[in-house]
Amino acid sequence: MTFYISSSLTPTHFSKPLNPSNTLFPSQFRGSLSSFVRRRKPTEAKLSSKFNLFPSRRNGLITCCSTSSFESTESSVSQEEDAESNRLFEKLRETERERLSNMEELERKANVQLERQLVMASDWSRTLLTMRGKLKGTEWDPETSHRINFSDFMKLLDSNSVQYMEYSNYGQTISVILPYYKDGEPLGEEEDSKKEIIFRRHIVDRMPIDGWNDVWKKLHQQIVNVEVFNVDVVPAEVYTTVATFVVWSMRLALFVSLYVWIDSITRPIYAKLIPCDLGTPTKKIRQPLKRQALGSLGKSRAKFISAEEKTGVTFDDFAGQEYIKRELQEIVRILKNDEEFQNKGIYCPKGVLLHGPPGTGKTLLAKAIAGEAGLPFFAANGTDFVEMFVGVAASRVKDLFASSRSYAPSIIFIDEIDAIGSKRGGPDIGGGGAEREQGLLQILTEMDGFKVTTSQVLVIGATNRLDILDPALLRKGRFDKIIRVGLPSKDGRLAILKVHARNKFFRSEDEKEELLQEVAENTEDFTGAELQNVLNEAGILTARKDLDYIGREELLEALKRQKGTFETGQEDSTEVPEELKLRLAYREAAVAVLACYLPDQYRPISETDINSIRSQPNMRYSETSGRVFARKSDYVNSIIRACAPRVVEEEMFGIENLCWISAKSTLEASQRAEFLILQTGMTAFGKAYYRNQRDLVPNLVPKLEALRDEYMRFAVEKCSSILQEYQSALEEITDVLLEKGEIKADEIWNIYNTAPRIPQKPVRPVDEYGALIYAGRWGIHGVSLPGRVTFSPGNIGFATFGAPRPMETQIISDDTWKLVDEIWDKKVEEIKAEAVIQIEEEKKKPQILMATHFF
């Protein structure tokens, strides 16, 4: 083995690698090294000393001694030199081995990098050629052809006819690429080189789940060469160099520059075409999360409650309407195949619909069923089904019913079902309305469709709007029972209060019973939720006052808070100017006088003040229990009372000095008159019900205005007459308000009963038929002169005398009638005078006597 030594002993200076078979080991090298040392010259010694080959003797000198001493010295030196040389060459051998392994690793990585670059270049070239259509019909870009069965694919594998395969969707879909002649004939056993060959892709249809095992067994028998690249390991093994970094940086810079240039050109164009699409981009989620989100759109969002779970709510928590509890408990027993109903041919209803005002306990009943039925329970909301994507509502409904049938017998509860069960063909038919209707149709199909299912699933729906639900959803066979959960009665309210008063502290049971009885009497038309809130508010007030028990004062205060009429008296007072204070005093005094003259038995007055500046009167009323059954006189009296602020301000300050504090009084009076005419059916306008003026045909609008003006005329005149009659009471109440700032109901009644009265002329009553007759006539001549009777289209019986245009109307006032009478009388007098003149002229003319006169 020949090797060269340079100025320093490093592995990189060997021109040829060491060969272990030709290397001199210490046992073979010992003798030659000793003789070499003995025979070397001083120059060689200097050379060896320079290169540190023999460090143990580099400072020593070779001297001549006696034979015995020289031999012993030579023997010891030879042993030291042999040991040192062994260490030296062992170090050289390890260093050379490390260098060779590093070179082999570098060469392997370079080959891997080159191979990856070649593969990438071939892939890019193949992709570009495919995009340009150069590889159309080859094995890289085959033509799409018909599907083949899995059995045919296995026959191809058995005959070793499969050369190319593709798989996608994680191996769930496989395709086989087969060669064909261009004229469409398949290749035979002997290939014709003159004909052109094309490749076609055939997707394998209906592949079994475990079909890959058979496919791989067949393919492994035909594999000739397999090349596997671990895409996660190979890039990590390739060393990044400066050149690679520079090249990829240039590529990235070129790509970014190209993107910015294209964006700068196209953005103004898109800004003009689609200006709404260029907003701030939203944060994008990762692709797997996107796929997961899109895949979960069709899944049901209903909350599942197993048979063993408890909701914390039982039927004991629902009080007031015991018959509803009995109905639902009986339905649950039928659903669970109770022995009482098994042999009687009774089937469980498919659906139960709970409807009623908000807060009456519909959702509470569903929670109680979920807690006590002992059956799987699915709770959903009507808004959970509809999304912005088409088909999501139907898919979620289908998934909900499929899940419930897998747990049958089970219960589905859909709260606010009107969100998806509204009538079809409404104003929201486009867009989201069509998607909602698809969900509704799926519910109809699942509840009672063509497909018959034996799984017992009970659907419970809850809604506040039964009137807007689709009739197909309400028919028997879908919702077999429709139960109204209405407002509780007095006994029901007492039972509800007892349920919610379990954890409340009262002084004694007798006092508790008495207070709850009083609250139940004063809370007519209260729902269960409102009663619960009353007791909770009373508990808050008790804690605020640092009391141990709930008392009557706290309950009444909580009741006022619930009704929205509670005032603490600690509100900030506003500075009221003297002139405005006088106006407020007259306004409140007028309202008080009218309330005493025309009392409202359902709203007795309580007190009033002038401490707050509002457009509405400050009069406060006492609430009475019971329902209000208003008569026509009550409506008319309310119209008169509403006119009091405007009338008193006009009489006291003049029509030129009106201000905003009485602005809403005439508006309120006009609205009440319109309500009386349109919605009560108590007037000559007719018994038909109209929600507002927009429901009227054009011919009836003038009649409504005429009748409303007639009621407003009567209300203003009557209110003015009452205030003039009780002028002294009005002034006295005003003085009390200016002095004290407030006045109670007892003092108001005392002043009203003791004040002197000034009699007034009776007010002309309301003439409903006269107002309707005058309304709609056309012009003076049409009224005064006789003519033909014509009927307005769409309004049978509406007659106008000589009216050429019945659609146009004009109201004739009393002054106009007086003017018509004057014109008529004047015209008659003129005609009479002309007749008298003509007669006198006739008398003055000479008479011609005929001959016959003498005979």
Curated annotation (Swiss-Prot):
GO terms for cellular component: chloroplast; chloroplast envelope; chloroplast inner membrane; chloroplast thylakoid membrane; plastid; Ycf2/FtsHi complex. Disruption phenotype: Embryo defective. Impaired plastid biogenesis and thylakoid differentiation in embryo. Defects in the photosystem II protein complex formation. The chain crosses the membrane at residues 242-262. Keywords: ATP-binding, Chloroplast, Hydrolase, Membrane, Nucleotide-binding, Plastid, Protease, Thylakoid, Transit peptide, Transmembrane, Transmembrane helix. It is found in: Plastid, Chloroplast thylakoid membrane. One of its GO terms (molecular function) is chloroplast protein-transporting ATPase activity. ATP binds at G356, P357, P358, G359, T360, G361, K362, T363. One of its GO terms (biological process) is proteolysis. Ubiquitous but preferentially expressed in young leaves. It comes from the Eukaryota. Pfam families: AAA, AAA_lid_3. Residues 1-78 form a transit peptide. Its main location: plastid. It is a single-pass membrane protein. Belongs to the AAA ATPase family. Homooligomer. Interacts with FtsHi2. Functions in chloroplast biogenesis and chloroplast division. Required for plastid development during embryogenesis. Might be involved in chaperone functions or play a structural role in the thylakoid FtsH complex. This is Probable inactive ATP-dependent zinc metalloprotease FTSHI 4, chloroplastic. The gene is FTSHI4.
